[in-house]
Swiss-Prot record:
Keywords: Cell membrane, Electron transport, FAD, Flavoprotein, Membrane, Nucleotide-binding, Oxidoreductase, Transport
Subunit structure: Part of an enzyme complex containing four subunits: a flavoprotein (FrdA), an iron-sulfur protein (FrdB), and two hydrophobic anchor proteins (FrdC and FrdD).
Membrane topology value: Peripheral membrane protein
The name this protein goes by in its record: Fumarate reductase flavoprotein subunit
Major localisation: membrane
UniProt cofactor(s): FAD
EC number: 1.3.5.1
GO CC terms, sorted: plasma membrane
Length: 583
């Protein structure tokens, strides 16, 4: 079957909903659809806890927010994109206020702000510690006012259709029925989130399998800066559930097994009773996660069945503050760790959290393929560089989701197709994909290979090779191992051949793309022979601006081989310098 829309947004999280709203606002005459693997309110945006950064205080400035972001990203951020981001973030948060987002308030009724890691001013808006949930709920309620926006909930996009170099639609499968549909579009926007599930221990929801990255990669768009994987310093052991940075912003301390605030040993300042901006627990995430590794190597972490941990101490904050500003943290600790942070230490360890890399786009979300756009964690614009600052991701998906929506609306209005229907080339692509999906559904496999085993081996390879610290030999081995996993995947089978909610088929389709994304991560890491931000090479321990002040671009050739190149970083105002914290 075939459907047709002017614009299709793939992904129903924060970036996808904001893009769809922007399209409806820009040109109400355009036919818009959202294709989402889950119901929108189950998207991973709901898991963002801490807040959203934007300059609104008289003592703050756009330049300071931009400089914090650029230095936090170890000077790999494109500064034109950063300047656009910080300029537009305030109006996006105010717009959410007008749409009903329940931001936390000061006693005088003004919006409250909290400190966040790497920021020199208090500029992070928050809704207790459920900011992402309230943000997404507000966007979803706003979207529902545009009744003409069609939703394909619980549909999985499997390939993009390309006609004469232009993206003109996609093929998707309905999870509830197994129905395969060709969906034609004048423009497509990818908003499918990150790819944290290529790792075994992550804060990411099960749906974050790099689908949009793989779709773009296979269609011919390059991935950018994929070696930069953010490890958040405070995840609950075993589950990987995030303990928000807001816990440290409100005054939480990180302690080693001796009860010592160990961050003072890693050039992050000296301990103070109250949180100090850009110091100690409010340093950037890459530095805090690296400090954990050093503590472990010194034998100062605590061994548990789920790996080494340190402790997050919130006891001195008291029950009233925790219940007012960190209620979800207390709930998570009780439900998943069986402890009460009001009276007990919280065990934490670094956990894969966010991809700084993604589909290469310009500041309007346009990829190198005409008709294809991307926003949110799927994209790399790049405002995050080598390390994202906490509370920048939510305003990023708002700013660039809106930009991508407006740009796609303009493009679609100028490139609306006639009623002739798809070209013969597009029809052939769609038929080929439908036949492939039918074959995947009937896979019986050879040699007993299982999808779950291949996925587990991929995750183990990524954890070993693309961790907080990396080295050349391990990355080289990882490239070879993932190539072998791709060969094993080709012979794997599935047991469930039904069409109704076939989760085994979904896992197979996800893993196919995950292997491509995983290969891009380790290949990019191998080629970058320096240490910068979240990419730390023990065999190249220094930052090398002469050779690597550039974005890594990875292209996938038609035979599956990768071609790696570099794109200079855009510097407008702030030349590279030392990252200074705690002073």
């Amino acid at each position: 079957m075939t459907a047709q829309h002017n614009i299709v947004v793939i992904g129903g999280g924060g970036a996808g909903l904001r893009a769809a709203i922007a399209i409806a606002e820009t040109n109400p005459h355009l036919d818009v659809a959202i294709v989402s693997k889950v119901y929108p309110m189950r998207s991973h945006t709901v898991s963002a806890e801490g807040g959203a950064a934007a300059v609104t205080g008289d003592d703050d400035s756009l330049d300071e927010h931009a400089h914090d972001t650029v230095s936090g990203g170890d000077w790999l951020c494109d500064q034109d994109a950063v300047e656009a981001f910080v300029a537009e973030a305030p109006k996006e948060l105010v717009q959410l206020e007008h749409w009903g987002c329940p931001w936390s308030r000061k006693p005088d009724g003004r919006v409250a702000v909290r400190p966040f890691g790497g920021m020199k001013k208090l500029r992070t808006w928050f809704a207790a510690d459920k900011t992402g949930f309230h943000l997404l709920h507000t966007l979803f309620q706003r979207l529902l006012t545009y009744s003409d926006v069609m939703r394909y909930d619980e549909w999985f996009a499997t390939t993009l259709l390309v006609d004469d170099g232009r993206v003109c639609g996609l093929v998707a499968i309905e999870l509830a029925t197994g129905r395969i549909e060709t969906i034609l579009a004048d423009a497509v926007i990818l908003c499918t989130g990150g790819c944290g599930r290529v790792f075994p221990f992550t804060t990411n929801a099960n749906i974050k399998t790099g689908d949009g990255m793989a779709l773009a990669f296979r269609a011919g768009a390059p991935l950018k800066d994929m070696e930069f994987v953010q490890y958040h310093p405070t995840g609950l052991p075993f589950t990987g559930i995030l303990i928000t940075e807001a816990a440290r912003a409100e005054g939480g301390w990180l302690l080693n097994k001796d009860g010592y605030r160990y961050l003072q040993d890693y050039d992050l300042g000296k301990p103070t009773p109250e949180p100090r901006l850009r110091s100690m627990e409010l340093g950037p995430r890459d530095r805090l996660s690296q400090a954990f590794v050093h503590e472990h190597n010194k034998g100062r972490t605590v061994d548990t069945p789920y790996g080494p941990v340190v402790y997050l101490d919130l006891r001195h904050l008291g029950a009233d503050l925790i219940d007012a500003k960190l209620p979800f943290v207390r709930e998570l600790c009780r439900d998943y760790q069986h402890i009460d942070p009001v009276v007990e230490l919280v065990p934490v360890r670094p956990v894969v959290h966010y991809m700084m890399g993604g589909v290469h786009t310009d500041i309007n979300g346009a990829t190198t393929l005409p008709g294809l756009y991307a926003a949110g964690e799927t994209a790399c614009v790049s405002i995050n560089g080598a390390n994202r600052l906490g509370s920048n991701s939510l305003p990023e998906l708002l700013v660039f989701g809106a930009r991508a929506g407006r740009a796609a609306a303009d493009y679609a209005a100028r490139h609306q197709k006639s009623d002739r229907g798809p070209s013969s080339a597009v029809r052939a692509q769609a038929r080929t994909e439908a036949l492939r999906l039918e074959r995947e559904l009937s896979r019986h496999g050879q040699g007993g290979e299982r999808i779950a085993d291949i996925r587990a081996d991929m995750q183990a390879t990524l954890e070993s090779a693309a961790g907080i610290y990396r080295d050349g030999p391990t990355l080289t081995k990882a490239v070879e191992e993932i190539r072998v996993l791709q060969e094993r995947f080709a012979t794997a089978g599935i047991d469930d051949h039904s069409r109704t909610f076939n989760t085994e088929l979904t896992a197979l389709l996800e893993l196919s793309g995950m292997l491509d994304v995983a290969l891009a991560i380790v290949e990019s890491g191998l080629r970058r022979e320096e240490s910068r931000g979240a990419h730390q090479r023990t065999d190249f321990p220094n930052r090398d601006d002469e050779h690597f002040l550039a974005h890594t671009l990875v292209h996938r050739e038609s035979d599956g081989t990768l071609r790696v190149g570099y794109l200079p970083v855009t510097i407008t105002r702030w030349p590279p310098g030392e990252r200074v914290y705690g002073r």
